[in-house]
C-alpha cells in the first residue's frame, strides 16, 4: 500500500472510531498523520509499505530520515544531506524546501550538498566549492546567498 493510500486509510479510520477508542488512539494517530503528511510533502507518497530499505535511492533514504527527524522534535542538531532533491518534481522540491526550513526553524543546522537551482535560491547561505570539489577537496570560490553569488 502506498503512503498516500495509507494516509487516506487512517483518515477513514478516524471517522469510524467511537469516542472512547478515538481518545485512546489520539496521540498515536496524531503522530501517524504528521509523519505520513511529511512523507507526502517530501515527495514519497508513492512508496509502498512493502518496499525494502536496500532498494531505496539515497535521496529517498534521506527524505525518510528527515521525516523521522521532524517527528522527534530534536533541536540543536546538525543535518547533512547529499542532494536530497535528486529525482524530485519541482512541486516536490518546493515541499522538500519547506520541510528543511521547518527543521532549521526548530533550531537545527541544515547543511545540504546540492546542485538544484531551486534549492540554492532558497538557501540561507551558499558555499561554492568550485571545480574538483569532490574527493580532491576543491576550494571555496564563492560564498553568500544566491543573489550575491550569481
What is the role of each PLM region?
Residues 1-150:
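Conserved phosphate-binding elements of NTP-dependent enzyme cores
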Amino acid at each position: 500500500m502506498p503512503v498516500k493510500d495509507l494516509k487516506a486509510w487512517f483518515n477513514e479510520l478516524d471517522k469510524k472510531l467511537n469516542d472512547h477508542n478515538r481518545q485512546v488512539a489520539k496521540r498515536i494517530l496524531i503522530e501517524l498523520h504528521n509523519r505520513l503528511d511529511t512523507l507526502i510533502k517530501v515527495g514519497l507518497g508513492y512508496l509502498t509499505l512493502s518496499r525494502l530499505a536496500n532498494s531505496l535511492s539515497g535521496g529517498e533514504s534521506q527524505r525518510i530520515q528527515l521525516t523521522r527527524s521532524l517527528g522527534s522534535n530534536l533541536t540543536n542538531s546538525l543535518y547533512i544531506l547529499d542532494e536530497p532533491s535528486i529525482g524530485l518534481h519541482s512541486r516536490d522540491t518546493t515541499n522538500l524546501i519547506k520541510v528543511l526550513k521547518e527543521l532549521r526553524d526548530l533550531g537545527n543546522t541544515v547543511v545540504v550538498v546540492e546542485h538544484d537551482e531551486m534549492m540554492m535560491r532558497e538557501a540561507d547561505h551558499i558555499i561554492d566549492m568550485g571545480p574538483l570539489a569532490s574527493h580532491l577537496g576543491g576550494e571555496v570560490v564563492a560564498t553568500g546567498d544566491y543573489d550575491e553569488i550569481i
